Amino acid sequence: MNPLCSEFTSSSRKAPEAAIGQVLIEALPYIRKFEGKTFVIKYGGSAMKDELLKNSFAQNVTLLRKVGINVVLVHGGGDAITRTAEKLGLVSQFVHGKRVTDNDMITVVQMTLAGKVNQDIVRLLSEHGGKAVGVTGLDADTIKAVPGPNAEKLGLVGDVESINTDYIDLLCRAGLIPVIAPVGYDHNGNIYNINADDAASSIAIALKAEKLIYVSDVEGIQVGERILKTICKAEAADFIEQGIISGGMIPKVLSAFKTLDGGVRKIHLIDGKFTHSLLLEIFTHEGIGTQFIAEQDNDQQENR
Ligand SMILES: Nc1ncnc2c1ncn2[C@@H]1O[C@H](COP(=O)(O)OP(=O)(O)O)[C@@H](O)[C@H]1O
Ligand SMILES: CC(=O)N[C@@H](CCC(=O)OP(=O)(O)O)C(=O)O
């Protein structure tokens, strides 16, 4: 008989311990599979705001790093930018989920994302024993940008031109957790506001990451009452067209498919409002959230 089963039946006192052991051991094949691999995590939503969720996220990330996974965090902070802008008398406007960014707004973006939000995350990870390093797109050419396609409406919103993977790899090899703020600059020294989902996508592709995981505030992609377990490109285009996918979910979904096309194998959207959702996603047999797949009914539908 399986020794774990006999423990369950012979001593009820030991049953809870055995159950915990069973949960922990379920992680072993995944730890073996992912050791030395790179995960890019887009950190956003409540998991960046609520104290309990922030701490649980930081513990999860630290644990992933400690078991040998190269974790690269790319953070958002759209709400924080909006609040800082308001205090300075600037009104935020969005076009298809992207912030209209003039000269004043780019200053607010830079000081909020790179100055405050980034450093708060670094401190949080450090508190939990994760050795994190704050990186903005400007450090060591981490994110070189070009003006985005809708520049006449959006202003200084950039697209990623290139990523300095050597620098990010160097940090990972040193056992550090790069925490990247999504601002970039171009050859003329102009600074650009880059949507964090787009930045995460480009970084995941450039690093040839094993996974890109979006941590957001939703259980997954919602259609009516249903949360989709998988979504393919054609469905997503229809849902955007019909307004079923809207606002900040549009850049997330578009960047997810760009990442899939760019060769990253697994892309997940998980709920940051759910404590330890990251660990559950990676280390248990049951996947959660929505997985992005190229086409419906192909073999990519298996979990992780
Ligand atoms: N079909 C949909 N399914 C889930 N969320 C959606 C959908 N359409 C629009 N949304 C909205 O998109 C938001 C996520 O985008 P955003 O706020 O930019 O996330 P984050 O700040 O985590 O990057 C959700 O909070 C939700 O209100
Ligand atoms: C161009 C653009 O819209 N940039 C975003 C950058 C931050 C971000 O993406 O934050 P979330 O992930 O929290 O939405 C912004 O200014 O809000």
UniProtKB/Swiss-Prot annotation:
PANTHER family: N-ACETYLGLUTAMATE SYNTHASE, N-ACETYLGLUTAMATE SYNTHASE, MITOCHONDRIAL. This is Acetylglutamate kinase. Catalyzes the ATP-dependent phosphorylation of N-acetyl-L-glutamate. Belongs to the acetylglutamate kinase family. ArgB subfamily. Pfam families: AA_kinase. Its main location: cytoplasm. It is an enzyme of class 2 (transferase). GO terms for molecular function: acetylglutamate kinase activity; ATP binding. Its EC number is 2.7.2.8. It comes from Chlorobium limicola (strain DSM 245 / NBRC 103803 / 6330). It is found in: Cytoplasm. One of its GO terms (cellular component) is cytoplasm. Coiled coil: none annotated. CDD domains: AAK_NAGK-C. Pathway: Amino-acid biosynthesis; L-arginine biosynthesis; N(2)-acetyl-L-ornithine from L-glutamate: step 2/4.
